[in-house]
Each structure stands twice: as structure tokens, then as C-alpha cells.
Amino acid sequence: MGFRLSHLSLALSFVALALAGVAIYRNTYEAIIMNNGSLLQNASPHFDSLESGVASILTLNNKKRNSDMYLRQQLTPEACVFSAVRGVVDSAIDAETRMGASLIRLHFHDCFVDGCDGGILLDDINGTFTGEQNSPPNANSARGYEVIAQAKQSVIDTCPNISVSCADILAIAARDSVAKLGGQTYNVALGRSDARTANFTGALTQLPAPFDNLTVQIQKFNDKNFTLREMVALAGAHTVGFARCSTVCTSGNVNPAAQLQCNCSATLTDSDLQQLDTTPTMFDKVYYDNLNNNQGIMFSDQVLTGDATTAGFVTDYSNDVSVFLGDFAAAMIKMGDLPPSAGAQLEIRDVCSRVNPTSVASM
């Protein structure tokens, strides 16, 4: 009798477990139908039963939970690259909002010196190679190199068999920074190459400086085939970010009318920063509003209002942010197309901070 009761108890336990399993299945089944009803309705001709449809939906949902690496590998080559770079840039800006402005500036400083060739990314090598990073316009100022290195590695890891230059990655990072900070996105075409050289002197002579008067600025932008309107639009990059006090808040570099805005220590150390407009983390038109009120921080910015033509563009952008954002995006596309110097040795770098050991990818 006891033996039979034991078997009966065991049987009842199995029944209870089975019923619990049915309940769990039903709850899961109903939840899946609720969340994927349209999928199941549309898919019914392809399944032997609704249960097999649920099983297929479960498989799809499991795939959704796979890593970003897996998802990116399902994209087209260009889409994979854009996704990989954007993930790194977004994380960097989330960690430090200022990084967005730094990446935009890094792209500008790359393209304005012998074209968009990734030259600014090359590290100095003691005694054998002098790059652009320690040229006065960039020394202790240009930043974001590590973000570009991380983005390059992300592309390598998640987009196998796709060769993308460091110059391309820098262009994408700048575009994504503009969008992340509230600006207008724009198309970035791929296909740039990386230079095997850099130009220390070119960084000093070709880049606009905070003490440049309007005539000098016009000449530097004209040398790159930019119009006056495009010059004023690109200056709008100063609507985000900060600059070193030692650079912008010294005599000759600062707009005298705005000098009281400089929030710097008496020693003007490199760690002292001055915001370039009153909303330094937002890609907006406040930079132009400040110029119209004679409150631009840098001398080179405020002189844009000293000429009737350039002052008119400042007013246009101050009056309508959408006009500024559209013109800025168009000017960035044009800048991103500046070609490397004629005769430059080019490649696709494996590591952005150094040239390849042998120029297997020379172009």
C-alpha cells in the first residue's frame, strides 16, 4: 500500500510539474503573440502551425539579443563602418561632452593642412619623424586621438575584411559629433587615404589662428577654395567647445570687449579653459548672437563683424539657425573632400598613429 502511495505521489508531482510547464509555456506564448502579433498573422502561410510560428519568433528574438558585433556584421560594409564609429563617438561624448567639439576641430585641423589625409594623427618618433601634433596650433590643444584609435579598432573588430582609412574615420567622427551635439547630420563619402608623412610647418602656416585679422583669414580660406560665406559658416564650429585660456584670453588673441568674460586663473595654465560661447555643449546659433553683441571671445571671431559682407552672413545665421546648420553641413562636406597634396605617398593605415611598416596598401 505504501509503495503504491509513493508511486501515486510521484505521479502527481510529475503532473504538477507538467501543468506548471504548460502554464509557463502559455504565458510565454501569449506574451510573444502580444508583442509579435503582426509578425505571426503575416507569417502564418509559412508555418505548419501557430506553435511553430512562436518557435520561429523565439529564434528571432534570441538573435536580436546578440552582440553589436554580430548585428554590425549583417549590415552593408559602409553601414557597418558608420555604426562602429558612431558607437565609439557616442560613448566618448556621453563620458565627456567637450569631446564632440574636440573631434570636430581635429577633423578641421587635419583637412586644412595638406588635405584630409590623417596626417594629424601620426605620433612623433624621436629623432626620425616629426608630425603635426606638436606644432603650435595643435600642441597641448588638439585632442581626441584616443577616440579615433578606438573607432579604428572597433571597425577592425566588427567589420571584417573592410579597409577604411583613418582619415575616413576622422571625417565620420566629426559628422557624428555635430549630430550628437544638436547639429544637422550630413553625408560622409568614404574613400580617403592616409598620408605617410605630416607637415609640422604647414600646421603653423595653413591653419587659421585666434589672432588672425580678417584679411589673413580670408586668404587662408581662399587658398582652400572656400567662399566668404563658407568661411563664416565653418567658423560656427566655435558654437561648441572650449579653448585654453593661454590661447584665447591673452592680448592680441582675445576680443577686448569680451575680455571680462575670460574665467581664467592669473597664471593661465593649460588646464584653464574658456568656453567659446555661452552654450558650449549645444550646436546652436548662440555663437553668432554673441558676435552680433560684440561678445565673441576670440579676436579672429569678432573681426567677422568688421566687414559688411561677412557681418551680413553672421546676421543671417543669427536670425535663422536652420540656415546656419544647412550651410555648415554643406561646408563640412566640401572641407571633407579636400585632397591630399599632389605626389603624397598614401596608404590605409593599420594603426592611425603610425605608418604601416611597408606600404602594402599604397595607392
Curated annotation (Swiss-Prot):
Substrate binds at residue 208. It holds the Pfam family peroxidase. Induction: During wound-healing and by factors which induce suberization. The keyword Endoplasmic reticulum does not apply. It catalyses: 2 a phenolic donor + H2O2 = 2 a phenolic radical donor + 2 H2O. Its EC number is 1.11.1.7. Its cofactor is Ca(2+); heme b. InterPro entries: Haem_peroxidase, Haem_peroxidase_sf, Peroxidase_pln, Peroxidases_AS, Peroxidases_heam-ligand_BS, Secretory_peroxidase. Keywords: Calcium, Disulfide bond, Glycoprotein, Heme, Hydrogen peroxide, Iron, Metal-binding, Oxidoreductase, Peroxidase, Secreted, Signal. The keyword Chloroplast does not apply. Heme b binds at residue 238. PROSITE patterns: PEROXIDASE_1, PEROXIDASE_2, PEROXIDASE_4. Disulfide bonds join 80-159, 111-116, 166-352, 245-264. Binds 2 calcium ions per subunit. Binds 1 heme b (iron(II)-protoporphyrin IX) group per subunit. It is found in: Secreted. The active site is at 109 (proton acceptor). It comes from the Eukaryota. PANTHER family: PEROXIDASE 59, PEROXIDASE 72-RELATED. Belongs to the peroxidase family. Classical plant (class III) peroxidase subfamily. This is Suberization-associated anionic peroxidase.
